[in-house]
């Protein structure tokens, strides 16, 4: 395929326009008075959301050079979401601000490599300061505040805090759609483990990137699955049953994996496959745990089982399975409560008998997985659009609450970044040349989230930012009440993990854009009937 190439300023301008287009669509959602964005969908009704990463994922631009810029800043939102689960709008906005500030200085003659060094140096200092300012999450009220700020809904905040209170800060909290108008929360039996889907083709919800299976059959296999003739009979039996299928095995490779992916793409069978966690004896023991929880049998050739002769009766099941890129959660396995309790007692006996502290720790981990319930929050609403929008907000709240428990919290509303910006500005005065310019560019970018939170609230962002800079640490601007005060006391708080992930990911992409000299894209195909048209009109419409 023919390529289009842009150099120097032309390449950077194309990228900048794409960055601006995507970031401008996302930043209207920032803050408690931010607006919604409506996304048109090829199937079903439109999606109404204020979730930054959902909006970013939906945007592709017609101009190929501008689209490169949009995809770069989209990666900031997606990576921040993957690491912290929230803060995607802040990350997108920071990337835009830093790209614009940096390109302005480069156009004025600054050395982009030196500017980059300054930005990198400043980013390290920002992360240090964020961690120094972090306050530990002391109680359930703090979790509720974090979840409320993330979702903009006190009821969601309270439900999320209550869910974590019931299952513990390391417990599993998941979200699903409710059959009623009201939200509801339950704690149910469940097991989670740190393995995600083997192929992204198994994803059923493109917005969240999750594979969700309702009432699936569960095939547990001790060894690798690599022979299609052995695998096909059980796959056909499941297909005839009309139920979804989850496969947990040491690995699935070659033709069997290709067959599963093909079925998923054609939607002829709703299926997902994950590797079994751990190694050796631990893997084997955990597979036995799963068999008891799901009411299934582990297919094991050493015990005389043949995969090709597996019956539906040997498969386990669960009410629901949710799989992300990194984790699998089984809710309400079909195994009997008596069998599960018997297994727990067996593990408790193993803990008492062992002299090895390492073995004891691993037994306790297994016991925790079998004992810890899964909190399920069900998103309610009058319409499918409302339910989906609420589901996204609950997911953000859950992720923010979990992040807060990991690295602590800081005052929210972008206020801490404004105050840190002043310190970075001070640092820039000690640096000579273009590294100092890079530090100043970073300082200006750090003030933009607070600026846009104020702007979305109908106020002059520049005036609000200057007033925030005068506030003591922990204080700032509350866009919900339009007042200045102690944000920590008012419960306007952000998780440190979310803010620091946003800063690190935004600066990483901005630095790439600043040092770009050439952009290469596929030449757009001419629309039908215009094959001989001028290349300038060859963009796809």
Curated annotation (Swiss-Prot):
Claim: Cytoplasm is one of the keywords in the record: yes
EC number: 5.6.1.7
Function text: Together with its co-chaperonin GroES, plays an essential role in assisting protein folding. The GroEL-GroES system forms a nano-cage that allows encapsulation of the non-native substrate proteins and provides a physical environment optimized to promote and accelerate protein folding.
Nucleotide-binding as UniProt keyword: yes
Main location (coarse class): cytoplasm
Subcellular location: Cytoplasm
Top-level taxon: Bacteria
Family, per entry: Belongs to the chaperonin (HSP60) family.
One GO process term, biological-process aspect: protein refolding
Catalyzed reactions per annotation: ATP + H2O + a folded polypeptide = ADP + phosphate + an unfolded polypeptide
Protein name (record): Chaperonin GroEL 2
GO cellular component, as recorded: cytoplasm
Residue numbers binding ATP: 29-32, 86-90, 413, 478-480, 494
Subunit structure: Forms a cylinder of 14 subunits composed of two heptameric rings stacked back-to-back. Interacts with the co-chaperonin GroES.
Classification via InterPro entries: Chaperonin_Cpn60_CS (IPR018370), Cpn60/GroEL (IPR001844), Cpn60/GroEL/TCP-1 (IPR002423), GroEL-like_apical_dom_sf (IPR027409), GROEL-like_equatorial_sf (IPR027413), TCP-1-like_intermed_sf (IPR027410)
UniProt GO molecular function: ATP binding; ATP-dependent protein folding chaperone; isomerase activity; unfolded protein binding
Keywords, comma-separated and alphabetical: ATP-binding, Chaperone, Cytoplasm, Isomerase, Nucleotide-binding
One Pfam family matching this protein: Cpn60_TCP1
């Amino acid at each position: 395929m023919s390529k289009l190439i842009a150099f120097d300023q032309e390449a950077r301008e194309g990228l900048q326009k794409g960055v601006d287009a995507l970031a401008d669509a996302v930043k209207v959602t920032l803050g408690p008075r931010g607006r919604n964005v409506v996304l048109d969908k090829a199937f079903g009704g439109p999606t109404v959301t204020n979730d930054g990463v959902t909006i970013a994922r939906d945007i592709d631009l017609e101009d190929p050079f501008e689209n490169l810029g949009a995809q770069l800043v989209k990666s900031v939102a997606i990576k921040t979401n993957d690491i912290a689960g929230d803060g995607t709008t802040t990350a997108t906005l920071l990337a835009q601000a830093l790209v614009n500030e940096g390109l302005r200085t480069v156009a004025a003659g600054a050395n982009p490599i030196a500017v980059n060094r300054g930005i990198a140096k400043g980013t390290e200092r920002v992360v240090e300061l964020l961690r120094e300012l972090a306050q530990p999450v002391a109680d359930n009220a703090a979790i509720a505040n974090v979840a409320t700020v993330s979702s903009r809904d006190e009821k969601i905040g309270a439900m999320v805090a209550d869910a974590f209170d019931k299952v513990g800060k390391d417990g599993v909290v998941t979200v699903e759609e409710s059959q009623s108008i009201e939200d509801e929360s339950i704690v149910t039996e469940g097991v989670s483990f740190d393995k995600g889907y083997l192929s992204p083709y198994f994803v059923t919800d493109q917005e969240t990137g999750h594979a969700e299976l309702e009432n699936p059959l569960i095939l547990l296999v001790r060894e690798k699955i690599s022979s299609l003739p052995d695998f096909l009979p059980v796959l056909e039996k499941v297909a005839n049953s009309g139920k979804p299928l989850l496969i947990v095995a040491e690995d699935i490779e070659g033709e069997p994996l290709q067959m599963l992916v093909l079925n998923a793409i054609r939607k002829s069978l709703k299926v997902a496959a994950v590797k079994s966690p751990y190694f050796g004896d631990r893997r084997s023991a955990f597979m036995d745990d799963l068999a008891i929880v799901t009411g299934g049998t582990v297919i094991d050739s050493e015990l005389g089982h043949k995969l090709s002769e597996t019956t539906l009766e040997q498969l386990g099941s669960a009410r629901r399975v949710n799989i992300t890129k990194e984790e699998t959660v089984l809710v309400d396995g079909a195994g009997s409560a008596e069998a599960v309790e018997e297994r727990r007692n067996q593990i408790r006996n193993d803990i008492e008998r062992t002299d090895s502290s390492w073995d004891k720790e691993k037994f306790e981990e297994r016991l925790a997985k079998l004992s810890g319930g899964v909190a399920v929050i069900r998103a309610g609403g009058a319409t499918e659009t409302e339910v989906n929008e609420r589901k996204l907000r609950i997911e953000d709240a859950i992720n923010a609450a979990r992040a807060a428990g990991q690295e602590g919290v800081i005052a929210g509303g972008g206020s801490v970044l404004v105050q840190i910006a002043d310190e970075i500005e001070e640092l820039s005065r000690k640096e000579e040349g273009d590294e100092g310019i890079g530090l100043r560019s970073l300082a200006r970018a750090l003030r933009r989230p607070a600026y846009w939170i104020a702007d979305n609230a109908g106020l002059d962002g520049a005036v609000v930012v200057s007033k925030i800079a005068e506030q003591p640490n922990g204080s700032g601007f509350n866009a919900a009440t339009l007042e200045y005060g102690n944000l920590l006391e008012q419960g306007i708080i952000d998780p440190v993990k979310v803010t620091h992930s946003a800063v690190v990911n935004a600066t990483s992409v901005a630095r790439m854009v600043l040092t770009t000299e050439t952009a290469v894209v596929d030449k757009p195909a001419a629309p039908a009937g215009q094959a001989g048209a001028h290349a300038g009109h060859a963009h796809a419409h």
